[in-house]
């Protein structure tokens, strides 16, 4: 019995030694397999992160300058003048006010600034660049020179959609031609009263298109005469309006719309009035110009709700 127990104990010890032998294969790997590298963030996420940091940097610079001006005014209100404050706001709104102007025209606007405003603009631009370089790092900042080589506020404007082209122009009552012959009206208001223009150009009485597209053009012309103004030029008047398109690339003009009538204003009536309204959709190219011609300009009604014309873009050209 004892001998059997001793033999069984030797058998167990032998099994343990065999299990710890280096030659015996192990179940499972000795070392865990290396994990796969983390996927790189998608380009859209990187671009969003960069734009977020960009906006944060611009906001920090603007807030810093605003705080500086505030505390400077609190310490000595006489040291900061109204001109300095106006200059600061003028710099911030420089690009917004220029609209579609290119870099050459923007440089001319910058040269028109006073020396103090130009120095403030240069300091502000340098502060923006240093702040962006500090946030995104020198290597990544050097990789986006196209953003900084153009306008100094183009970075803030890249995400801003371009303004929809439109114009509403009212006649300049102080510069209406006289006579009864057909003339081109060359003096319009674009920023007075109801007149407004955006993303289009008014030059020498002609409305220039800056974007290709389909536009709705309209014109309203009113003729009037009172007996206190004297006699009319003729018993029968041809009261007409023409909306004309002029191409600059290929010098030519075409009538897009016309309207009017022949009126007899020779009666005993104290007051005569006639209104013409025309409108329509047209495909226009950048650089083309729209103008208005009328007959008997001396009879025009100069009120802003009587004689006007305009245009607005409806859709792009496919």
From Swiss-Prot:
Subcellular location: Cell membrane
Stretches in topological domain Extracellular: 69-318
Keyword check for Nucleus: no
Any one cellular-component term (Gene Ontology): plasma membrane
Keyword Cell membrane applies: yes
Membrane topology, Cytoplasmic segments: 1-47
Post-translational modification: The soluble form derives from the membrane form by proteolytic processing.
Single GO MF descriptor: receptor ligand activity
UniProt keyword terms in alphabetical order: Cell membrane, Cytokine, Developmental protein, Differentiation, Glycoprotein, Membrane, Receptor, Secreted, Signal-anchor, Transmembrane, Transmembrane helix
Organism superkingdom: Eukaryota
Residue ranges of domain THD in the record: 165-314
GO biological process: animal organ morphogenesis; bone development; bone resorption; calcium ion homeostasis; calcium-mediated signaling; cell surface receptor signaling pathway; cellular response to leukemia inhibitory factor; cytokine-mediated signaling pathway
Tissues in which the UniProt entry reports expression: Highly expressed in thymus and bone tissues.
Compositional bias annotation for Pro residues: 31-41
Similarity-based family: Belongs to the tumor necrosis factor family.
Function: Cytokine that binds to TNFRSF11B/OPG and to TNFRSF11A/RANK. Osteoclast differentiation and activation factor. Augments the ability of dendritic cells to stimulate naive T-cell proliferation. May be an important regulator of interactions between T-cells and dendritic cells and may play a role in the regulation of the T-cell-dependent immune response. May also play an important role in enhanced bone-resorption in humoral hypercalcemia of malignancy.
Description of how the protein assembles with itself and partners: Homotrimer. Interacts with TNFRSF11A and TNFRSF11B. Interacts with FBN1 (via N-terminal domain) in a Ca(+2)-dependent manner. Interacts with TNFAIP6 (via both Link and CUB domains).
Protein name: Tumor necrosis factor ligand superfamily member 11
UniProt gene name: Tnfsf11
